């Protein structure tokens, strides 16, 4: 039983209401949504596990809230004593409860953001959103370009219909929530949205409330922990589920909104159905960089699976289209086609495997006759892919299926032209246009799969070939000799190797991947990305291997520059590549380059990485212009600020001028996929943000930095890099401190991804993946990779010359790149709490390292103060009270999980740590007691004391949910 005086203790929702700031507008229901969900959850908790457990959860929450009010470290100790006194089952239940609360808080926030946005659209009021830079919609952007910036409507239309945003979904292991829970969360979100609709009846409200409670209980009763790591095929299926649930219907809905927005600036045309505004690609099953589980067989499987899913989605809609296009009037072109198809079909033909239109369609329904043939081929396309996926072969001939998107679209275009010719354009611009836009966007493969591989793996293959040919060791050759040999082979026609080539397992894997690319239809694939690319030979090597493996339609080859030195050398490498006549002829005036935000940040710290990424883009674009090449930048951004994350619109608008120019590729990783596409409104908003920001950047580029700003940035970057590397790579105590002070070593137990946390099993920070590196610091709310280096750079230049402070403030107020960079770090400080890191040190770190931790926390505080000084703010987030409120609502439950995590890690790492466990407090009924016991038994193979490992994992997941990112 909880020991505090519960009569004096405020309920959780009462405490929530106290957090409501005075300035919140009438349409802001976030506190109300949050309180409703928590009230429902606490009632469920009491029903399932008794009043004592509910009171304990409330007591824990109150202690955390008291700490958040005064930041008294004694409250953390009091909280720790209470938490460590819980038995194994109760400990899991408390951690699970707070993790659940934070997931519910996220859902309340998503519903509120959608509601707030809709209300602002109705009122046309964006005054409190700094011109809505984070929420801008397409109509607002078009009006701004035409009415404020005096662009002609036709100029805007031409730019829009020719631009492309390619969103690349990746399986980066940052989505810590199981798909089973994501689906339940979606239903909770829908219930909450409907509950606050204005036209709801009392009966509707009662039924929705029951449904809400049912889904909250179902989510709480679901095991949050993945008991086995997902396979790449699992990741692919999870990623593809977003297409089925939101993206598939979201794209035509969004394009209709674009049509409406164009009409409102005087353009009476619709966006052409084949305009490439939005494209989708994927790395799921294609990204083999450091992931041995992504094999050639996996790549083949995911391509066939995506092809089957695409055919199935089209097939599920074609009968609706047949019902809609029932008219008999058509043009001669369609009539001739319909009569041919009708004559060639068997008399009295029946198709019992169809639900509708299973008998032969009469010739006086010409649209249905033509669409019926489309349906037949879609059915065969789906079945052939299914056979190939399950059996490896199919008796359905390829000519009975659709093999390219042009032949699929041909019949649809025929119907569209006929309707327009007969005066039925309004009908043509309905479901048929939506369907054609889907076909143009998703093709026959749903997404295009990128292949990613390390450059060293290609070098190993070519080394084996040159040794087999007895012409030397490719690995030992200079760059010049490599290029000379590669170009001579690319210019010739002789095959380089046959079946007698000696192959290690690694070499066979690389070659078999190329063979899979050659075997499958070319529209399955997008780019071939080379990670750790440093020289032109890295690109030419892939070109040669594609030819040797008989790939008829070679993939475009994209070098990925990640580390600071590689980014600095990238422009020169690209210039050398463009100087090669053979290569310039090959690319036909188009090149793509990928830049990595994660590894550059881990290598040099956020400040220097951000500035080098900015400069590299400018220089790469200049090189491309010099050689007459159109360059597309592919941004490898993660969800966290440490890995290049941040609000989409701001991120795009802060890129250097001329670097997007109507063509953008960007990764959508892990938990960001759910945040972007988890629900229809989120999907719609994501498509709007990317399209609007890309258009605005191209037509109204941000300012270029002044020469004196550049000089100051260069100076600060040197200081920031030195500060960052002196601690992370050169400080001999750092690796030991990092592994003791954070849950980095325990990260792999979450089973959130298919790939290992390290590129190589041994080694220090260099071999650690960027995601677990950021994840570990996010969990302790210290965020070291984000801010380390900023403070030292600011301090040095301000001490050198006080005028530099004025210049920094000028840069913040006038230069979007600098402002966005600092604002994102400020947001991270709003989420941070060095006292949590200090508690971790006292519990988990050896005493001789305590002064080192104190030193880092002093740097944290110094950086925070300098950041506020440069931004001209008195306190963190003073310019964004809405975001400040949203973060404050999370602090108490996150703090609870921080404390549970710290003490659980102590018990895991130090078996001699004594705790006095009180009797179980969850309800004493046989059923409830059994429930708590079963929670402990869900992990029977744990090497630790009962309940500890699951409690730890639940805290990791809950903190990730509360911080709204993992790695």
From Swiss-Prot:
The modification Phosphoserine is found at residue 11. This is Phosphoenolpyruvate carboxylase. GO terms for molecular function: phosphoenolpyruvate carboxylase activity. It catalyses: oxaloacetate + phosphate = phosphoenolpyruvate + hydrogencarbonate. Through the carboxylation of phosphoenolpyruvate (PEP) it forms oxaloacetate, a four-carbon dicarboxylic acid source for the tricarboxylic acid cycle. One of its GO terms (cellular component) is cytosol. Pfam families: PEPcase. It comes from Glycine max. It is an enzyme of class 4 (lyase). InterPro entries: PEP_COase (IPR021135), PEP_COase_bac/pln-type (IPR022805), PEP_COase_Lys_AS (IPR018129), PEPCASE_His_AS (IPR033129), Pyrv/PenolPyrv_kinase-like_dom (IPR015813). PROSITE patterns: PEPCASE_1 (PS00781), PEPCASE_2 (PS00393). By light-reversible phosphorylation. Its cofactor is Mg(2+). The active site is at residues 172, 602. Keywords: Allosteric enzyme, Carbon dioxide fixation, Cytoplasm, Lyase, Magnesium, Phosphoprotein, Photosynthesis. Coiled coil: none annotated. It is found in: Cytoplasm. It comes from the Eukaryota. One of its GO terms (biological process) is photosynthesis. Homotetramer. Its EC number is 4.1.1.31. Belongs to the PEPCase type 1 family. The keyword Lyase applies.
């Amino acid at each position: 039983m909880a020991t505090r005086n519960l009569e004096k203790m405020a309920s959780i929702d009462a405490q929530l209401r106290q957090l409501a700031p005075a300035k919140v507008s009438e349409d802001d229901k976030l506190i109300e949504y949050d309180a409703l969900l928590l009230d429902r959850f606490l009632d469920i908790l009491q029903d399932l596990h008794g009043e004592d457990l509910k009171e304990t959860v409330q007591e824990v929450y109150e202690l955390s809230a008291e700490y958040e009010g005064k930041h008294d470290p004694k409250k953390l100790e009091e909280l720790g004593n209470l938490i460590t006194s819980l038995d194994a089952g109760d400990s899991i239940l408390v951690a699970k409860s707070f993790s659940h609360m934070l997931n519910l808080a996220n859902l309340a926030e998503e519903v509120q953001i959608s509601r707030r946005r809709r209300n602002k659209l109705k009122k046309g009021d964006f005054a409190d959103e700094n011109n809505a830079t984070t929420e801008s919609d397409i109509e607002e952007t078009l009006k701004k370009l035409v009415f404020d910036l005096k662009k002609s409507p036709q100029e805007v239309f031409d730019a829009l219909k020719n631009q492309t945003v390619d969103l690349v979904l990746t399986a980066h292991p940052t989505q810590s929530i199981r798909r089973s829970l994501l689906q339940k969360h979606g239903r909770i979100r829908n219930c909450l949205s409907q509950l606050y609709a204005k036209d709801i009846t009392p009966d509707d409200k009662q039924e929705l409330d029951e449904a809400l409670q049912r889904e909250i209980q179902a989510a709480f009763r679901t095991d949050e922990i993945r008991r086995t790591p997902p396979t790449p095929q699992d990741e692919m299926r999870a990623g593809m589920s977003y297409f089925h649930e939101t993206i598939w219907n979201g794209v035509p809905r969004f394009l209709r909104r674009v049509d409406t927005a164009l009409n409102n600036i005087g353009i009476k045309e619709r966006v052409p159905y084949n305009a490439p505004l939005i494209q989708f690609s994927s790395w799921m099953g294609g990204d083999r960089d450091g992931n041995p589980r992504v094999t050639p067989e996996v790549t083949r499987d995911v391509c066939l699976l995506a092809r089957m899913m695409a055919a199935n989605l089209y097939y599920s809609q074609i009968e609706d289209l047949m019902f809609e296009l029932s008219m008999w009037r058509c043009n001669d072109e369609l009539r001739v086609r319909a009569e041919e198809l009708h004559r060639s079909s068997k008399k009295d033909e029946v198709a019992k495997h169809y639900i509708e239109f299973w008998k032969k369609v009469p010739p006086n329904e010409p649209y249905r006759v033509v669409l019926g043939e489309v349906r037949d081929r879609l059915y065969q396309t789906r079945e052939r892919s299914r056979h190939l996926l399950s059996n490896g072969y199919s008796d359905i001939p390829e000519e009975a299926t659709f093999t390219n998107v042009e032949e699929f679209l041909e019949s649809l275009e025929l119907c569209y032209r006929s309707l327009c010719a007969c005066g039925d354009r309004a009908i043509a611009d309905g479901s048929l246009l939506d369907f054609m836009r889907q076909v143009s966007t998703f093709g026959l493969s749903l997404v295009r799969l990128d292949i990613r591989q390390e450059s060293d793996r290609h070098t190993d293959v070519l080394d084996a070939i040159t040794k087999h040919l007895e012409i030397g060791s490719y690995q030992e050759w200079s760059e010049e000799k490599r290029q000379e040999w590669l170009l001579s082979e690319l210019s010739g026609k002789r095959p380089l190797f046959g079946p007698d080539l000696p192959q290690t397992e690694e070499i066979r894997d690389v070659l078999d991947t190329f063979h899979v690319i050659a075997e499958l239809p070319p529209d399955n694939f997008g780019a071939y990305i080379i990670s750790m690319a440093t020289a032109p030979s890295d690109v030419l090597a892939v070109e040669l291997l594609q030819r040797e493996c008989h790939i008829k339609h070679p993939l475009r080859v994209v070098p990925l520059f990640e580390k600071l030195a590689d980014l600095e050398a990238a422009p020169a490498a690209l210039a050398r590549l463009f100087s090669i006549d053979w290569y310039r002829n090959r690319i036909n005036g188009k090149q793509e380059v990928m830049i990595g935000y994660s590894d550059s940040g881990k290598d040099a710290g956020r400040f220097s990485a951000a500035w080098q990424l900015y400069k590299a883009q400018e220089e790469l674009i200049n090189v491309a212009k010099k050689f007459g090449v159109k360059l597309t930048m592919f941004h490898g951004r993660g969800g966290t600020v440490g890995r290049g994350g941040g609000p989409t619109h701001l991120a795009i608008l802060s890129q250097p001028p001329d670097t997007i120019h109507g063509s953008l590729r960007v990764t959508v990783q892990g938990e960001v996929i759910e945040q972007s596409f988890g629900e229809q409104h989120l999907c719609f908003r994501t498509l709007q943000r990317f399209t609007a920001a890309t258009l605005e950047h191209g037509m109204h580029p941000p300012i270029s930095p002044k020469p004196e700003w550049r000089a100051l940035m260069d100076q600060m970057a040197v200081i920031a890099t030195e500060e960052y590397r002196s601690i992370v790579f050169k400080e001999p105590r750092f690796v030991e401190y990092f592994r003791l002070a954070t849950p980095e070593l325990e990260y792999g137990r979450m089973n959130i991804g298919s790939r290992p946390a390290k590129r190589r099993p041994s080694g220090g920070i260099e071999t650690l993946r960027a995601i677990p590196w950021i994840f570990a610091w996010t969990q302790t709310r210290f965020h070291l990779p984000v801010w380390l280096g900023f403070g030292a750079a600011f301090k040095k230049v301000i001490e050198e010359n006080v005028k530099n402070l004025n210049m920094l403030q000028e840069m913040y107020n006038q230069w979007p790149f600098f402002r966005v960079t600092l604002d994102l770090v400020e947001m991270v400080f709003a989420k941070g709490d060095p006292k949590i890191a200090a508690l971790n040190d006292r519990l988990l770190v050896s005493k001789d390292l305590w002064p080192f931790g104190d030193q880092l926390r002093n740097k944290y505080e110094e950086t925070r103060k300098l950041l506020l000084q440069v931004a001209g703010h008195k306190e963190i987030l003073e310019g964004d009270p809405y975001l400040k409120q949203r973060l404050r609502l999370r602090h108490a439950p996150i703090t609870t999980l921080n404390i549970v995590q710290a003490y659980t890690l102590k018990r895991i790492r130090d078996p001699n740590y004594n705790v006095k466990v009180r009797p179980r407090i969850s309800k004493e009924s046989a059923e409830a007691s059994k429930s708590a016991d079963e929670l402990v038994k869900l992990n029977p193979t744990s090497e630790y004391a009962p309940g500890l490992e699951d409690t730890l994992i639940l805290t990791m997941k809950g903190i990730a949910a509360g911080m709204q990112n993992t790695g």
